[in-house]
């Protein structure tokens, strides 16, 4: 795997699924291919994106700044600086300085990533902030190692919380989670339907699922009533795709 492919993989792993993720993936591809040279426009676009956490925006802003050539005098952006200040915790800043000194001695992406993984997310963010604010310099490879270590830690904590959701036994939470997943799947079906001849059929299935979820939420139902709702929806989607001649590998 090439360095930029690895960076793209790690960065995208912390972004929630949806149309925005696809848009960000395209921006990263363009930036890494040298097709987008307007850093200021890119940062303005990033600043106004909804859904993303400040830290995620900070990491993306850091990656864009590392990759897109810019004039030396270009101002640093406040929204990135605020996101990469380690929550203003002096302990994070102390650890970030120690980490920075170690990173100065590293020359490879993997070496930097290994060193960085032993630090907390707050310290890693603060260290990115040091480099972003030009208070310290490391090679681009080492900076990318720092980025990927940070993303790995964030993705780990997200994965733990997803696992907890999967093992949760509270029927009310499981019921709501199934309905949320059904709504999300319905939305994906509508987006995939596009303008094909059978699109109306897919839209109809998705619409019915939405209405069912809405009705369940409005009148209140037994927590078991949503069991199988998302699976039924996925079966409908797979049947629709087979007729379209599209083989769906994995959609769960």
UniProtKB/Swiss-Prot annotation:
Instruction: Cite the SMART domains for this sequence.
Output: Flu_M1_C
Q: Does the keyword Ribosomal protein apply?
A: no
Molecular-function GO term, any one:
structural constituent of virion
Where can this protein be found?
A: Virion membrane; Host nucleus
Give the location of motif Nuclear localization signal in residue numbers. 101-105
Which superkingdom does the taxonomy of this entry point to? Viruses
A single GO cellular-component term on record: membrane
Entry's Gene Ontology BP terms:
viral budding from plasma membrane
What membrane topology does this protein have? Peripheral membrane protein
Q: Which UniProt keywords apply?
A: Host nucleus, Membrane, RNA-binding, Viral matrix protein, Virion
Major localisation: virion
User: Partners and quaternary state?
Assistant: Homodimer and homomultimer. Interacts with NEP. Binds ribonucleocapsid by both interacting with genomic RNA and NP protein. May interact with HA and NA. Cannot bind NP without genomic RNA.
The record's comment on protein family reads: Belongs to the influenza viruses Matrix protein M1 family.
Per the entry, what this protein does is: Plays critical roles in virus replication, from virus entry and uncoating to assembly and budding of the virus particle. M1 binding to ribonucleocapsids (RNPs) in nucleus seems to inhibit viral transcription. Interaction of viral NEP with M1-RNP is thought to promote nuclear export of the complex, which is targeted to the virion assembly site at the apical plasma membrane in polarized epithelial cells. Interactions with NA and HA may bring M1, a non-raft-associated protein, into lipid rafts. Forms a continuous shell on the inner side of the lipid bilayer in virion, where it binds the RNP.
Q: Under what name is this protein listed?
A: Matrix protein 1
* Organism expressing this protein natively: Influenza A virus (strain A/Chicken/Shantou/4231/2003 H5N1 genotype V)
